[in-house]
């Protein structure tokens, strides 16, 4: 299964939602290693020394979409989710992209 995460908070928040996101991804990667974990973020960061697990990958906006990370997260991340083959998507910060309905992925906040 390919599990996708809105990982902005994972990479840029040192506490609260960032801790929740890092713990969730780290523990799932460790205890469910057969899954693939896809981390969607407007840009890569390195908050708190988080190391991306071997069974995880990072997706960032490309081209013109990279100009506005917040617009990408809200209105274009669904396309990236679809192209990445995500089966289930978790909006870690209690948000889902507006275009999540255009994907085949199940979603949860």
Features from the language model and the residues they span:
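Carbohydrate transferase catalytic cores enriched for Leloir-type hexosyltransferases
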Residues: 1-109
């Amino acid at each position: 299964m390919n599990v996708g995460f809105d990982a902005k908070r994972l990479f840029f928040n040192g506490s609260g939602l960032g801790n929740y996101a890092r713990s969730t991804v780290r523990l799932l990667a460790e205890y469910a290693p057969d899954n693939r974990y896809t981390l969607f973020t407007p840009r890569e960061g390195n908050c708190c020394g988080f190391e991306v697990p071997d069974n995880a990958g990072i997706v960032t906006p490309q081209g013109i979409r990279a100009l506005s990370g917040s617009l990408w997260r809200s209105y274009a991340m669904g396309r990236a989710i679809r192209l990445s083959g995500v089966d289930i998507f978790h909006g870690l910060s209690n948000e889902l992209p507006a275009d999540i309905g255009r994907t085949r992925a199940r979603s949860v906040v």
